[in-house]
């Protein structure tokens, strides 16, 4: 998995970057090596809310998640949970498609 973390409207400290990278590292087991993950962390100008957005460019599919809370770390945590659910669904869908093709050719 190739991971890119960037920020918009806030200073991205090395501590915050490493926190995001370690949390998103949980996805590495579920994704292929060639999968690219882009994450943008932002502070909204009004309301003091923090947003974490991610795009996962998997084979044949782009998964996208956005989470916004008053705490940036909580936004990152919720973002990773959201992505994990999407990746499980994506992998299950691909597994069923392969099974369907195999059954079709085997008949």
What residue ranges belong to the model's regions?
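N-terminal, polar/charged subdomain of small-to-medium soluble alpha/beta proteins
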Residues: 1-107
């Amino acid at each position: 998995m190739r991971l890119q973390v960037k920020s918009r409207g806030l200073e991205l400290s090395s501590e915050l970057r490493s926190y995001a990278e370690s949390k998103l590292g949980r996805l590495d087991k579920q994704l292929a090596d060639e999968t690219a993950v882009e994450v943008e962390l932002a502070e909204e100008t009004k309301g003091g809310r923090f947003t974490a957005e991610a795009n996962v460019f998997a084979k044949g599919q782009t998964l996208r998640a956005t989470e916004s809370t008053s705490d940036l770390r909580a936004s990152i945590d919720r973002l990773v949970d959201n992505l994990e659910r999407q990746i499980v669904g994506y992998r299950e869908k691909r597994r069923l498609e392969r099974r369907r093709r195999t059954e079709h050719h085997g008949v």
